[in-house]
Amino acid sequence: MADQHVERVASVWYVELSGPDAAQVLRGVLNTLPAQAGFQGAELLSSPAQPQLALIASRWAGEPPSLPVPDGAKHWVFTVLEARP
């Protein structure tokens, strides 16, 4: 059996923004994340049920660095308690 290395995600950082340009604004934030230490991946999300709401869900090897968020954005860091592949 091949040795599989799975990088452990320790934290998830969510950033939420509402408004007609929310996805465009958060896309700018998303583009800065790969250069940060501990970054493991992220998605920019939207929902047809809430068309003016956009969300970044990013995964980190440890605590995410303290990063600026756009005016009006809400953000939270969660500790990953359990994960499944």
Predicted features along the sequence, with ranges:
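Short S/T/G/P-rich N-terminal loop/turn motif that feeds into the first structured element of a domain
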Residues: M1-P85
